[in-house]
């Protein structure tokens, strides 16, 4: 019986894989991204908890609303991670971020279970990044960004992201509990790898202000 209960709770517990992602994003001064990851983890955890045995008391919202925000948060996390990788200056950064916030909300409401809810943001972000980087390469007549970014950050990050989506859409029927839990872990790892080592746009006038985990929680709530 204990094994059955543990198996049912595993998707909920595996959503905690986003906690290190939140912590790392905060340390790298990607505060907005950290709040999005925390938002995603919160709704993913409660969405799965509502399916758990005897945990219906945790369903503080309707099941479909929890599902909506868990999927919306996941897609938005992909978008903000890729926009952080693009390293835009203002006002492009806030403009593209808000573009994702609005369009992903509409797309998720229209069809939250299709491939498009994830492929749309990923494809659009990839196109935007490609245009910017190709322009940079043309200006400097060389590779942009550095080769190490491709080998240590982009390559591994995209591999884990591709693995996560493959698990999500093609292998969950094998064993939903374990496959979906690995999906959470692969997705969280992808976000960590894609985030730059430091947010250059956060300012460098002295030491950055401390943003605690409790502050992030209060902001999201």
UniProtKB/Swiss-Prot annotation:
Cytoplasmic topological intervals: 25-29, 86-93, 135-153, 197-221
Signal peptide (residue range): none
Coiled coil (residue ranges): none
BP-aspect Gene Ontology terms: muscle organ development; myoblast fusion; myoblast fusion involved in skeletal muscle regeneration; plasma membrane fusion; positive regulation of skeletal muscle hypertrophy; skeletal muscle tissue regeneration
Effect of residue 2 to A: Does not affect subcellular localization
UniProt key word Disulfide bond: no
Modification note: Palmitoylated at the C-terminus; palmitoylation promotes localization to the Golgi apparatus.
Name of the protein in its database record: Protein myomaker
Conditions for induction: Expression is induced in muscles in response to muscle injury. Expression is induced in muscle progenitors response to muscle overload. Down-regulated by in microRNA miR-491, which binds specifically to its 3' untranslated region of Mymk leading to its down-regulation.
Function statement: Myoblast-specific protein that mediates myoblast fusion, an essential step for the formation of multi-nucleated muscle fibers. Actively participates in the membrane fusion reaction by mediating the mixing of cell membrane lipids (hemifusion) upstream of MYMX. Acts independently of MYMX. Involved in skeletal muscle regeneration in response to injury by mediating the fusion of satellite cells, a population of muscle stem cells, with injured myofibers. Also involved in skeletal muscle hypertrophy, probably by mediating the fusion of satellite cells with myofibers.
Membrane topology of the entry: Multi-pass membrane protein
Segments traversing the membrane: 4-24, 30-50, 65-85, 94-110, 114-134, 154-174, 176-196
Compartment(s) where it occurs, according to its Swiss-Prot or TrEMBL record: Cell membrane; Golgi apparatus membrane
Organism: Mus musculus (Mouse)
Lineage: Eukaryota, Metazoa, Chordata, Craniata, Vertebrata
